[in-house]
Amino acid sequence: MSLFSFPISTELLPWLLLLLIPPLLIFFLLRSPKNLPPGPPRLPILGNIHQLGSLPHRSLRDLSLKYGPVITVYLGSVRTVVVHSPETAEEVLKLHDSECCTRPKLSITKSFFYDGLGLGFTKWGDYYRDVRKLCVLELFSVKRANSFRNIREEELSRLVNSFSDSASSGSSVDLTANLAKFVASFTCRMAFGLSFQGSGMDNETFLELFTEANRVIGKFAAADIFPGFGWILDRISGLDSSRRKSFQDLDTFYQKAIVDHREKKKTEDREDLIDVLLKLQSQETKLGSSRITDTHIRAIIMDLFVAGVDTSVITLDWTMAELSRHPRVMKKVQAEIREHVGDKGIVTYDDLEALVYMKMVIKETWRLHAPSPILIPREAMTNFKIKGYDIYPGTRIHVNAWAIGRNPDVWKDPDEFIPERFVDSNVETKGTSFELLPFGSGRRGCPAMYVGLSTVEYTLANLLYHFDWKATEEVSVEEAPGLTSHRKHPLHLVPVNVINRKL
C-alpha cells in the first residue's frame, strides 16, 4: 500500500466533504480581514503592480481619488496601505507612530544597507534608538552642523567662481550636474575630511558611483513583492548583481577612508564624522548589544550619502527649475536677497533668517516636488485603525507625501507654483505639519534636517544673489522614475554676472 493512499470508500467521500466544508469556511472567514481600507481589485500573483506604472506616487494618488484618502493595494502578495491626506498621515505618523515605526524586511536592506545597521532601514528596537541618539547628538546636532560651515563656504566658492567664468564667456552650465558635484563634495569632506582629489577619485568617477547607487536602490525588487521566489527574478534581471557591485564599490571606498583615518592620512585637520565615530568606537560605545565596529561606521555613512546628498540636490534642482519657469518669482526672491545683503559680495549664514520669501520658495518646491514622493515604508507591529479601517500586523504602510502636497482639499490651485500661499501660514517643515513632509515625521523623521536645510538655503541664496539666470530652452518638469523625485532632464541655464566679484 502506498504511503499516500487512504482507504476511504467512495460512498463516504461526499459525507466527509459535507463535514469538512463548514469548518473550512468558518476558518477562512475568520482569518480574512473584514474591514480593510478600500482599494482596486487585484490580479492573482501580481496584485496591483500593473496599476502603479513608472511613477507610483501619481498612480496611487489617482486611485485615492476613486477609493478615498486611505487605500489598500497589493504589491504581489504583500498587503500595503497608502495614505494620501494630512489627516490620515497624522494618524500614521503621530497617533499610531509607536504601533508602526518599524521597517519591513526589504531586500535592499540586506544587500545595500548592511542588513539594517544604519538608520533609515533599521528595524524598531534598542539598536535603532541607540543609532538615532548617536546621530542626533553626535553627528547632526546644530553645533556639529555649524562646525562644517567653512567647508560649505569653500565648496560654494568653487561653484560660484566656476559659474562666474561661464558667465564671462556667455556659455550655459549643466546646473543639475554641478549641484550634484557641489553637494557630494561637501558631504565627502564633512564625512571623511577629504575632497574628491584626496579620495583618489575625480568628480566624475565619484558621481558615477553615487548615481549608479541611486539607480539600483530606486528599482523595484521582485524579492520584496514575491517572497520565496522573487530573488530568482532579481538574479535573472541582473538587479542582484548590479546592487552587489555598486555596494562593493562604495563599501571599499568607505573602508579605505576609515583605514586612512587610523593611519592619519586624511587631508584636513578638522574633526569629521569618521573621526567622531572612531572616537566613539575607541570608547567602546554600544549600539544595542554590540560595540561599534567598522561595519557600523560604514552603514551610518552609507545612509548619510544616500539620503543626504540626494535630498539637497533634488531640492536645489527643482527650485531653480521652477524659478526659471516663473520669472516673477525669480525677480522677487532675488530682490529680497540683494536688498538685504547689499554690496557685501556674499550671503552669510546670518543673513538667511531674514530671507522670508526665499524660505517660502523652498517650501513651495517641497510641496510640489517632495524629495521622497512616497516616504520609506513602515510596517504595522500591532492591530490598530486608520480612519476606522483595520490595520493588521505585518501590513506595509506608505505615506504619499507628493499627493498630500497636491491635495486640492488642502491647497488652492495645488498644481501652481505660488510661494505666497505660505504668507501668514503656520505650516512648517519639521514634521509637525502634516500638510508638508519633506523630512518625514515621528520616530522615523530625518535626524539630519538641519544640515540639509542649511545646505539648501545657503546655496540657493548665493546662486540667486550672484547671478541672473536665463534658460536656453523650455524647462522640463518631467520626473524621472525612481523612489526619489529627480527631474528627468538636466537643467541647462546661462548665468549672468550681477555681483561681479569672485569668492
Swiss-Prot record:
It is found in: Membrane. GO terms for biological process: indole-containing compound metabolic process. GO terms for cellular component: endoplasmic reticulum; Golgi apparatus; membrane; mitochondrion; vacuole. Heme binds at residue 446. GO terms for molecular function: heme binding; iron ion binding; monooxygenase activity; oxidoreductase activity, acting on paired donors, with incorporation or reduction of molecular oxygen. It is a single-pass membrane protein. This is Cytochrome P450 71B6.
